[in-house]
């Protein structure tokens, strides 16, 4: 690719939650050959952003930040108090992003992960409007920090609201704020999209972040993902930015249960990271 890709990996591959002690992973991530580390923020109070920033600098790593949106961080909840909790959490995340000098916060922040139900069209509209109105407020908050938000479609088993590139673009259009942008995750795309290349083109220049693993959450290159189409799509839109491996360790039981990881996907998590990066560089570097 002629445009610059930063190859990254999420610390979820090894640990959960991310804390200040997780900086012990950074030398290994750099040694493996990564440009970027992705920090998932489950609890902002566990993270000393200035300590993290120094460790990133010491190891020559760039950083991206994603949020974690469980039942207590649901902008479509019927109780406005839950919205307030989510706003407070997002404010903490935005402050962390500013200290780390990143440009956006990523994640499926329109609703709670795992909220997947059959509801009436009337209820769906109520929840959609809640998401739009609350995300307009989130965008105003983000803009106050000179940040964007990267909204992520999830597969149908994890969300009943935003599953495809077309869905997320409708959401971005309805929000109608320049801070509303998009993250695409190849794992979810292999479940929901009819054509990966077309989906990427649907998002176009709204795409500011990309996550990948495989259709089975395993090492990139070992599954059914149409990687040629993936690369062509990113080439079409002249994408430059992060290409981050996001998978999980079955050793952290709570996290494994949340994402349905019941078995190891490689001999070790380090091998997962090593093999995955090798494949991505072979595929996405010209």
Briefly describe each language-model feature range.
Residues 1-11, 15, 19-30, 103, ...:
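Histidine-acidic metal/acid-base catalytic patches
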Residues 35, 39-132, 240, 244-254:
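Structural motif corresponding to the early beta-alpha repeats
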Residues 81-181, 263-271:
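Active-site acidic/histidine proton-transfer and metal-coordination neighborhood
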Residues 13-15, 41-43, 69-72, 109-113, ...:
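Active-site-proximal loop/turn and secondary-structure-junction residues that shape catalytic pockets
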Residues 7, 63, 149:
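Hydrophobic anchor at the start of a short beta-strand
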